[in-house]
Regions:
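Compact nucleic-acid interaction/catalytic patches
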Residues: 3-10, 16-49
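C-terminal terminal-subdomain/extension
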Residues: 53-99
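Generic, low-specificity signal for short hydrophobic/alpha-helical stretches with a mild N-terminal bias
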Residues: 12, 32, 70-74
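Beta-strand-connecting loop/turn residues
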Residues: 12-13, 55
């Protein structure tokens, strides 16, 4: 598993793996990616928007959770957002530091 890979969780929702590749705890810290069309406007740097499979998705950074790694290994990653690490880390900074 690689940090900033997008996986399809059971039930079909997309999640972004936020955890470093350097530790293996049997679980992974993830945040949901929600279709931009299904909710309120994204909140600035806290909720960056990414295009995945041709559609806009909002990263719900403040709703992070740890899930068993096995939930993410049932299929290949849907997308690789490692090229957006600046935006993702910025969103995490907002959650943990407030700026």
């Amino acid at each position: 598993m690689a940090q900033f890979q997008v996986y399809r969780a059971p039930g079909g929702r997309l999640v972004l793996d936020l955890q470093t590749d350097l530790i293996d705890t049997g679980s992974r810290v993830v945040a949901s990616l929600v279709p931009a069309s299904s909710g309120p406007k994204a909140i600035g740097r806290l909720e960056p928007v990414f295009t995945i499979e041709g559609a806009a998705y909002v990263l719900h950074t403040a709703e992070m959770a740890a899930v068993p790694s096995a939930l993410l290994t049932q299929g290949a990653p849907v997308a690789d957002l490692s090229g957006s690490d600046y935006e993702i880390r910025g969103a995490l900074d907002i959650v943990f530091s407030g700026f």
